[in-house]
Amino acid sequence: MIKNLFALGVFAPILAYSNSYIVKLKGEISTAEFSKFGEITEIKTKTLNFLKIKTSTSLSNIQLEQIRQNKNVAYVENNQIYKTQNQIDDPDFSKQWSLKNTGRNSGGFFSWGKIGEDVDAIDAWKLELGNRNIKIAVIDTGVDYSHPDLIENMWKNQAELNGQEGVDDDGNGYIDDINGWDFVSNDNDPMDGNGHGTHCAGVIAASHNNIGIRGLMREAQMIPLKFLADNGSGTLEGAIKAISYATNIGVQIMSNSWGGGGFSQALYDVIEEAQNEGILFVAAAGNSRNDNDKWASYPATYDLDNIISVGASDGKGNKARFSNYGKTTVDLFAPGVDIYSTFKNKSYKKLSGTSMATPIVSGILGLMMSQSQSLNFLELKEKIMDSTDQSRSLGSFSVAGRANAEKALQ
């Protein structure tokens, strides 16, 4: 069962399951007292304890108040639904205007784009190409980890790869999670049946291997964490688990091209937990032409220092017509229109959205970390924002301008 929830200050309707709830606990306690409300699932992160309560029908206000009044309960909220935010020698590099904009490769049928309105990737690669020590979680619809342009830069869980089949060799609660995890089906195969996550992964770190395209990073380790189903939607429960998994394996960057829910204290808490570990959370600003200063778009507009909110620009250097914006809540822009990248089933495709702009920023941050691994997340955030290209067309829409990889590495 799904219902629409409208929250004051949120532009779009909030989707949530009417028979599924997330309960934050104040400590480790017996779950038996909650079983009268429905089926109980425990969700534990590094420092947080949650329960999911699945009921046959919606809980009444009286029942919800009974849960809230429990001395061991911090809060209870609906299990919300999130969705994707999309609308060189490598033979298809010429199609990647976001990396090198010639004008001809970035415009529409009747008009060209503008030369140079890109992230200066070619000049950036003269300074840094990436590093296998940088781990980036792609929290999305999964990734086609067998794609020939991605396979070299996919993370492998060495403990499980070299361990015993059917055994949780690394003791993290997930059996045989060699390639990451599918939190939709709760299994060890995060293969992408949608294509969105694979597209994002290619933007970050498609190999520079004379096949297809190039990602921002020549070398990296990308971890596919699938919490969005093949139809592009996922739950608060899945988001919590995916973010917690990424935190526990020690990623440096989480790339998040999704959103659409209202404020969730549980989601805030688990992102804050990642912040406490020094992890950057790059988030799509949204695609509803929305002023995020007035109408929040989560998770991008949570007031947390590790979040970098990304809007989308077009081939002429303007704000993409669909992109959300916000002078105080959108940190910077990156190309997000007709972005050519890897896709499911070992293919390639153009997609548009703040979903596409987000992994560009994740990839630039990965290059910056490769160059200066001593910088903390606050220093990296400040540096990427201070090094943006300024323009009148974007100046009123974000804190900074458009991301520039070369300047960020200088």
Language model features by range: what are they?
Residues 1-18:
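Classical Sec-dependent N-terminal signal peptides that target proteins to the secretory pathway
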Residues 29-30, 57-60, 80-84, 141-145, ...:
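Solvent-exposed loop/turn segments at secondary-structure junctions
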Residues 103-146, 158-212, 225-236, 292-295, ...:
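Active-site-proximal loop motif in hydrolases
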Residues 72, 132-135, 218-223, 248-254, ...:
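Loop/turn elements at helix/coil->beta-strand transitions in domains of secreted/extracellular proteins
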Residues 17-98, 123, 251, 270, ...:
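Inhibitory N-terminal propeptides of secreted protease zymogens
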Residues 68-135, 143-153, 238, 398-401:
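Protease zymogen maturation seam
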Residues 214, 238, 247-258, 264-270, ...:
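C-terminal subdomain of the subtilisin-like protease fold in secreted/lumenal serine endopeptidases
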Residues 279, 297-374, 378-382, 408:
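Extracellular S/T/G-rich loop segment that most often corresponds to the catalytic His/Ser-adjacent loop
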